[in-house]
Amino acid sequence: MSFRIVFTGVRQAILQEAQLPALTPNSLLLRSRASLISTGTELTAFGHRFERGTHWDSWVKYPFLPGYATVAQIEKVGKNIRDAKVGDRVVVRAPHASHHVVKKTQIAFVPDAISDEEAVWFAMAKIAFAGLLAANLQTGARVAVIGTGPLGQMVVRWLATTATSEIVVIDRNEKRLALARKGGATHTIAGALEEKIDSVVKRLGGHRPELIFDCTANPSVLANALRLVTDRGKIVILGDTGFPAEQHLTSDLVLRGISIVGAHDLHTQGDPEWGDERKIFDLFFQLLSSGRFSTANLVTHRFDPRQAQEAYLLAESAKGKTGGILFDWSKLK
């Protein structure tokens, strides 16, 4: 028997029985172990928090299947598949559900030394990686990361593996800032960006950052990021707001020659080196195994999938304060 989490309407999440497709000679049956809530994407869909006419408006239709980051174990192997076996632990981009039938090309293998709670960040790490590709990061750059939710935490950790000179992180929540420091941030500043621009410049020795990552999905951030970034600097928008009409440009854009680039999960498609996202997952696992990238202790809340409504209401009410929120599928027997 298979179960999946479904948004049946605005702010309504349930666990319901689901019908699986038949196993074919070229597919795998997976049993989920853990799946991570994307508190940005999924809360936008859960609360129907977006403008009419946006891509959100055309995508989010109820019933809606949330989720895209699952750690699972192989339960059955199609007869034509030779390089996977029952018991192998894998990751898959799939909605929150107890079981999945997938092709071999949809999975990446998890090294034994990496726990489920570390591995489950693979998809969020991939999205952050797309942001770094869009940034065309320069050696020695001073970088500011605005927002240290799950996505911002991944950006900080990727930056820490590069030759950036300084990584300053701005967020209202001290606990999230502490996690960012563990992930490699060189400076952390608590508060709202509009009140902390001078503090950022001071921390950077009187310099403005050459590069800013906006990981907030808060439309008010862009105008203040434009004030903060250096002349001819770059702003990468990773947080996908549901209210783009509320994002405002300032005269800094033209007068100071600033570049703004959007980065999205799908932007690695067609990339000559990273078009197969499994290569990014494998790199992520290599860095986890070597200790150069850590996702340990980033999960702060764990839920039985039968508590889906409770999980999303908590994520909504404590937005900006939680770390990773995880569904533990071992609770379903």
Language model: regions and residue ranges:
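Glycine-rich cofactor phosphate-binding loops and adjacent beta1-alpha1 units
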Residues: 178, 183-261
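N-terminal glycine-rich beta->alpha transition that marks the start or flank
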Residues: 18-70
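Mid-domain Rossmann-like dinucleotide-binding core that forms the NAD(H)/NADP(H) cofactor-binding site
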Residues: 115-193
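C-terminal substrate-binding/catalytic core of Rossmann-like NAD(P)-dependent dehydrogenases/reductases
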Residues: 198, 202, 206, 247-299, ...
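Residue-level marker of beta-strand positions
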Residues: 34, 69, 88-89, 99, ...
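A glycine-/small-residue-rich N-terminal strand-loop-strand element
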Residues: 69-93
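A structural motif shared across PLP-dependent enzymes of the aminotransferase-like
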Residues: 93-104
